[in-house]
Amino acid sequence: MDTKTHSLPITHTQLHSNSQPQSRTCTRHCQTFSQSCRQSHRGSRSRSSSQSPASHRNPTGAHSSSGHQSQSPNTSPPPKRHKKTMNSHHSPRRPTILHCSCPKNRKNLEGKLKKKKMAKRIQQVYKTKTRSS
């Protein structure tokens, strides 16, 4: 029984020693998460950018009933311009996604660790009560 009680503080100190590498792994996880987030946002935004020129074409098509030849070449360059501007909008938005996602993940991890520690404490107290009785 004495050996078990001595082994419990060792595991408790191991939890504290493991808390620092977990914060390092969190930053690594945030970096990988942000990269995957960038890729997913590229795909979703490229779809929206392809839809937005199509919506611009519909009104111009309605107005171009008088002259199809003059406005058909004019409608093709604006979608290219929109794509370039959308790409320029990507760069300022990416750091905000990076910056916002990491603290949320850290808070969630801290909460999970606290719950695990509390569950272990409750189990230890329960075991000691049952042993003493």
Swiss-Prot record:
Keywords on record: Chromosome, Developmental protein, Differentiation, DNA-binding, Metal-binding, Nucleosome core, Nucleus, Phosphoprotein, Spermatogenesis, Zinc
Start and end residues of each stretch annotated as Disordered: 1-133
Residues where Phosphoserine is found: 133
Binding positions (Zn(2+)): 12, 16, 26, 30
Ranges in coiled-coil conformation: none
Keyword Membrane listed: no
Amino acid composition bias (Low complexity), ranges on this chain: 46-72
GO cellular component: nucleolus; nucleosome
PROSITE patterns, A to Z: TP2_1 (PS00970), TP2_2 (PS00971)
Superkingdom in the source lineage: Eukaryota
Tissues expressing this chain: Testis.
Biased composition (Basic residues): 79-93
One Gene Ontology biological process: spermatogenesis
InterPro entries noted in UniProt: TP2
Motif (Nuclear localization signal): 111-119
GO molecular-function terms, A-Z: DNA binding; zinc ion binding
Function (record text): Plays a key role in the replacement of histones to protamine in the elongating spermatids of mammals. In condensing spermatids, loaded onto the nucleosomes, where it promotes the recruitment and processing of protamines, which are responsible for histone eviction.
Family membership: Belongs to the nuclear transition protein 2 family.
Name of the protein: Nuclear transition protein 2
Organism (species): Gorilla gorilla gorilla (Western lowland gorilla)
